[in-house]
Amino acid sequence: MAQIGINAWVWSSPITTEELGRIAPIVAGMGFDLIEVPIESTTDLDYRKGAEIARSNKLAVSVCAAMGPDRDLIHPDESIRTNGMNYVRHCIDAAQTLGAENLVGPLYSAVGRTWQATPDERRRDLDLLVHQLRELAGYAGEHGVMLCVEPLNRFETSFLNLASQAVEVVDEVDHPACGILLDTFHMNIEERSIGDAIRAAGSRLRHFHTCENDRGAPGSGHVPWDEVAGACRDIGYTGPFVIESFTNKVKSIARAAAIWRSFAVSQDRLATDGLRYLRALL
């Protein structure tokens, strides 16, 4: 049976120790297998207590990086690059303590930063990212954590938009602790064929975000879910499928993710509808 999870951002932000303690029993009670924990501030969550919360609710864990303006592995400003590297190392340590196998997200640049680049400039940025990720993957591997690099849509980054671009990066990093996260919300915008994108990622695919075209519950929009499931079967994907959505009740996350309306009658309903659909699909 597929491992199905949900990101705690569906209900709240930031995810503090208290919020995780509130949300985890809800997630477990609904029948999810995994909770994805975003790390916004490095002081929000007591990771040892977080691990206890997850264990007591029989939930596996993944960790989601929040790449803000001062956390960017390829920024022209060296101090911002250094801060980004330190933040990702912190997330790796957090993942190990939480018992998470995967650290996921756009592990290259700040969300929302876009820029024009010549082919030579892009090659320079790629070389820098490969160097940075190779170092981080070494650290992650020592801590039993897999880095999962996520392409985003063109409105959130200009650097990695396609599965094929993530494949290029991961192949150049060439480290067993560096893989790919694909997200159907972003693929629906950028990929000409979602199935082909998944097949291109192949064995590099280690994490999967199941998001509807409007970031609502899977099955409520027009993402071609049969194509998604078929392609995942084609490549023998056995990793988690995680619902990632957001609440418009928390202004900071609503603004960051451009969430201006609700996608279901309640966040609980979004979660249960999505879980029911994915269980039937997968």
PLM ranges: what are they?
Residues 23-44, 65:
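N-terminal substrate-binding region of glycoside hydrolase catalytic domains
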Residues 1-28, 99-101, 160-182, 187-282:
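Histidine-acidic metal/acid-base catalytic patches
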Residues 43-53:
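Active-site-adjacent beta->alpha loops and helix N-cap segments on the catalytic face
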